[in-house]
Amino acid sequence: MILIISSLLDRHARVVAHALARRGVPAFIGDVMEFGAGARLSARNGDLHWSRADGATANIAQTRAVWCRRNFTPNFDPAMSDPCDREFARRQWTEFLWGSVYALDVALVNDPYLQQAATKTLQLSEARKIGLRVPDTLITNQASAVLDFVERHRGRVIHKTLGTAMDQTLFTKRWDGRDAEALNCLDLAPMIFQEQVRGHREVRVTVVGEAIFAAEFDTCGKIDGRADVDAPYRVHDLPQEVVDRLQALMTRLGLAYATVDLRIDGEGDYLFLELNPQGQFLYVEIKTGLPITEAMADLLIGEDSEAHRSAHRMPADPPAALLAAPRGDTSRWSAGSRLAS
């Protein structure tokens, strides 16, 4: 059995579960949105039973791999209004869930600890180290530094957050002169500021174990391609040099799955923008026909042989931030060298 930690409302979870079922491999979607709202979990003597609100039940101890598809926000009863109580309950759920997952000692896609470690600050640093081009980047909460940065790039600057705002999608935005008026709020929390890359071609890369799928689209002047769901996508043939460096980045970060955003500048060079260990791929698959779902099923059931050969090993020469990873199958999956077309 494959455990998919997500939500029953998540199309990605349902589609991959269906692909696994077609192969005769059962999958159980553990709905983390039901924590505090109908889910029942019990661990005893090596068994872990998970019951969903719809009555479906599974013994998670029989799991052969876990896809940590989505983080969770417990759906607590509004009557639990005290912030301290809610935070205490959230921590209880967090320890129970991830402690139980690590105790399984099976392949994790991706290890939840490593997913958290793959922050924008770390991934930008690691991308530079392995030779990927990265736009000039400033991460700061200092207004004067931002103004100097904007002046240096003659106003051609974009800005984005380091993380998400709960369940909201926060898009990357182009610097506007009026943004200077809001810099007094920057003291509260840092943000990312980058030079705006010239060029209108963006490549969405999906890495699944050894396989790499790339799709190109025209941004049509938009700063954040995610804002245009109707943009036409076409299969893109990445240069082998870029493929090798993306694989190296995945290995250094200890990730088996991620989506990567690249921008092609006016000279045809590829620039690394960001990586998402839980990025979406269905819209790319639907528009291009790339078999990403099948690749994910292969990875989870173990047909990605190179990934299995890397079981129980930390990434080669990992960044220091990953060396404190907790015990468990923290690096069973690593990227290899096959380019899927």
Residue ranges of model-derived segments:
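Phosphate-binding site of ATP-dependent enzymes
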Residues: L20, E151-R245
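A long amphipathic alpha-helix within ATP-dependent nucleotide-binding catalytic cores
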Residues: D187, E195, V207, I223-Y270, ...
